[in-house]
Amino acid sequence: MLKNRKSNCRLRYVLAYTILYLILVGLLVLFFRLQNRSLVYHADAWRQHLRALAYYGKWLRGNLWHLLHDHSLTPQAWSFGLGYGSDVLTTLHYYCIGEPLAALTVFIPERFTKYYFEFLILLRPYLAGLSFSAYAEYMIGRKQLHGTGSCTTTNSGSFPILCGALCYVFSGTVLYLGMLHPFFVTPMIYLPLLFLGVEKVLRERKPRIFLVTVWLAALSNFYFFYMLALMTAVYALVRVIARTRGEQAIRNAGAGNAGAGQTHRRNCASWIPEALRRLLQLLGYAAVGTMAAGAVLIPILVQFQSDPRNATSHGLPLFYEKEYYSELLKNAVTFINHPLYDTELCLSVVCIAAVITLFFLRGHGQLKLAVIGAAVMLCLPAAGYVMNGGSYVINRWTFAVEFLFAFVLTVVWSDEQIRFRGKNIGRGLAFLLVLVTIALNIVIGYVRIPAGENGGSGQNGFPSEFADEQTAEEYMTAAGRNESAAVTQYAEETEAPAFYRYTGRDLTYNAGTQTQTSSTQFCWSLANGSVADFFKALGVNEEQNFSYTGLDDRTALEALAGVKYYTIAYDNDYEKQFVPYGFADCGTVEAWNSAESLQEKSGAVYGDDSWEPVVPTYHIYQNTFALPIGYTYTGFVQRSAFDAMDLTERQETLLQGVVLESEDEERMNAGKEDRQETGNGEGLQARVSGLEQVQPEFSEEKRTYTVETGDGVSYVAEADDGVSNALEGPAAPAADNGKETSASCFRVTKAGAKVTLRFEAAEEAETYLVLRDLDTGPLDGKDEKDGEDEKSDTQAEIQEIYPIHVTALRDGTALTDKTLNYKTEINQYYSGWKDFAINMGYRSHGADALEITFQSEGVYSMSELAVVVQPTEEMMRHAVDRLVCTMTDVDLHRNPLSFASSEITGTVNAEQDRYL
C-alpha cells in the first residue's frame, strides 16, 4: 500500500513537472517562432552540430548496410568528407557519437534531422530536471542529510524539489549555452545521477545506477566525462568522510564508553580504514563503468593526445581581468551574450535568496563549504584551466554551480527552520515567485540581450542569432547548396578520378560532410595533430590549428595535397587573382542538389509563376598538377636537413623527396648494410634500401627591399654586429635581405599604421612575405602614444589578437590582400605558430611592393622579415616528376550509404624502389 502511494506521488510529481516544463519551454519557443527563427544557432550549431548529427545517422545506416551486405561487424570508420579525411568516431564523438539520444538518428531520414535536432534541444533539459528530482527526492525525501552537519528536514511535500528542478533546467547553461551548443546540457543529466549513484552505493550497497551512469557519461562525451569525473570524485570524498565519521560517532555514543579518553580517540580514528574501503569500492565501480565504454573512449583518448589544442601551452594568469568580475555579478541573475570564458550562470533570484538564507540557518556545513568553494572557483582562472583539462581557461563547468544553487533552494525550503505562515498559501506564493522569476529570466534575457559579434543587428534580441525557420526541403537545400555540391556535380559530369580534393575562396564550413567530398576545409574541435604540424612546418597562414580553410593558395602545396579543383563563390576579377598557378578555367557551375529549391523571401509558393529557384553559382578551376591519392618518390630528405631550411624552401623540397624521420633513416641504413654484407634481397629493409638521399634544388629568390614607415610606426633593424638602427620616416634605408638577415622590430603607437617594403618585381612567380619567430606585445610605455599620455608598464595589457594586414602592390595599385591574425598565449585559440610565409599570389607580372598595416598598437618583433619570390614553372617541374609512377586502379571501397571506408586499394608498377 505504501509502495503504491509513493508511486502515485511520483507520478503526480512527474505530471506536474512535465506540465510546468512545457509551459515555460513553450514561452521560450514562442520568442523564436514569433520572429520566424529556428532553434539552430547560425554559427557552430549550423556549421558543426547539425551537420555532425545528420552524418551520424547516415553513418549508422551505412554500417548496418555493411553488416547485412558484407557480413562484417567492423565499422567503416574513415570519412573522406571530414576535411582532408578523418576518423569518424574521434572527430564527431564530441558532438554526438556515443550519446544514446543522438543514436536514434539511425531511424531519422536526413531531411528531418533538423526537427530531431530541435527536439533534442528541448528534451535534454527535461531529462536533466528528472535526474535532479531523483537525487533531491532521495536526499531530502528520505532524509539522507544526517551525519553531515545539516539540520533535519520537514515533510514539505514535493514543492521544494519541483522548484529546484525548474531552477536547474532553466539556468544559464540551458537558456544560453545549451541553445548555442545543445550537447553542453548532456552533463546536466548525468551529474545528479552520478551523485545519486554514490549515495546508493554508500547507503544501500547498490551500484547499478552508478555503474550505468558512468558508462553512459563515458560514452556520451569524453570532454564532459572528465569534468563529471572530477566533480564526482570530490563529492564522493566529502560524502564518504562525512558519512563514515558520522556513523563512527553514533557507534561511539551508543557504546557509552566512559573509560579512558585514549580508547575513545582510537575509536574515533577507526573510521579512516572504512572510508578508504568505501572509496576504493567506488573507484572500482567507476573503473568498471569506464572500461565498459572503452571501445569508444580509448580511441578518443589516443586521438586527444595528438590533438593540436591539447598540445599547445596557453598562458595562465593569476586573476581574471576586472571586466570579468563585474560581468560575473550580472551573470548571476541573467545570462550574458558571449560571456567571457563561457561563464554562464543565469540563476533564479529565488536561488540566490536561498543561498543567502542558507548562511543564517544552523547546520548545513557541507553545503555552505560547497557554496564558498564554488564562489572561489568562479573567481580564479586556475579552476577553469583545470576543469578544461589544462588546455586553456574556460568555464564550461558552471552547470555544477547551477546544480548546487538549485539544490540549496530545495534544502533551504525543506528545512524545519523555514516556516511559512498559512503553510499552503505561503508555499504557493513562494512557488509562484519561482515560476515568475524563471519566466522573467527567459523574457528579459531573450528580449533584452543584443545579438553578439556573430549575430545580426540585435534588434530582435537573442533569437536574431539563429537560423530562419525552415521546412525539411528548405533545410536540405540550405545544407547542400554550396561549393561542395558544385564540385561533386562537375566531377561526376567530367569523369574525375576516384579521389580528388577541392579548395577555394569563402568555403562553406564542413560542406563536405554531406557530399563526402574531400576538401582543405576543416572545422571540428578534435583534430588530427599531423595536419597542424604540417601547417606549422610550412608556415601556412591559417587561423587555428583545429579549424582551417586552405593552403594559402600555394601552387606546390595544392599539388601535393591532391587538390583537383579551386572554387570561387564571388565571381569577379578581384577573387580571380587568388587562383594559383596551373589551374585551368572550367567555367561556372550551378550547385543543384536533390532537394527542392529554396523559396524566395517574397513568399512565393513552389510551382507558382512568381517562384524562382535560388541556385548559387560557383566558378571552378581545375589543377593540371594535382597529384593522385598515391604517388611515389625515389629519394628522401633527412628531417634534420628539412627543419634547417627556409619556409619556402621546404615546400619545394617536398616536391623532390619524401621527408623521413630519424627512425626511418636508421631503418634504411640498416637495410643497405644488410644488403651489402649478406646480399639479402628480402624483407622491408631491403625493399626500401634503394632510396637515395636527394639534394633539393631551389628556384626561390630572396629580394632586397627598402622599408618605408608611415605615421605611428618606427622600424628597428638589428645588424649582425649587434648595433640597432631605429628607422623612422617616409624613406628608410634598404635592408639587407640575404641569407643572414637581421632581426626586425616595429613599434606601433597608432592603430592602422603602415609600413611599405619595396623590391624588384618578378615575372611568373608567387610572392611571399616571410616572418620568422613573430612575437607581439604591448608598448612598454617609454614613448608617448600619438595624442595620448604615457602608459605605464602596469597599465599595458596584452591583447588576444594582433591583426597584420598585407597588401600586394604593383606600381602603386593594390592587387591582393591577406590578413594574419596573430594570436597570443592568452587567446583560447592560440596555436603556438610563430613562423609564417604569407603567399600574396601568383602573377605573370608580380608585385613590386608589400604594404603592411598593423591594426593594433604594440611591439611586433621577428627574427627575420623577408620577401621571397618563387618562380612557379621551374618549381612545378618537380611535380611532373611525381606523376611518372603513381597508384592506378584506385578503389576507395566507399559505403554506398555513408560513403565511409576502411580500406584503399590500388596498383603501383615501379621499375625501381620507391616510397609511396
Predicted segments with their positions:
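Membrane-embedded helix bundles of polyisoprenyl
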Residues: 21, 121-139, 149-241, 281-301, ...
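Periplasmic/ER-lumenal interhelical loops and adjacent helix-loop junctions
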Residues: 47-48, 54-59, 63-66, 94, ...
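Membrane-helix boundary/interfacial segments in multi-pass membrane proteins
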Residues: 115, 174-185, 311-342, 371-421, ...
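Membrane-interface helix-loop-helix junctions at transmembrane boundaries of multi-pass membrane enzymes
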Residues: 267-280, 355-377
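Perimembrane helix-loop-helix junctions
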Residues: 228-288
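Start-transfer (signal-anchor) and selected internal transmembrane alpha helices
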Residues: 1-32, 277, 281
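Membrane-interface coil-to-helix junctions
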Residues: 24-129, 166, 170-188, 306, ...
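Soluble catalytic regions of membrane-associated enzymes that act on cell-envelope
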Residues: 107, 442-916
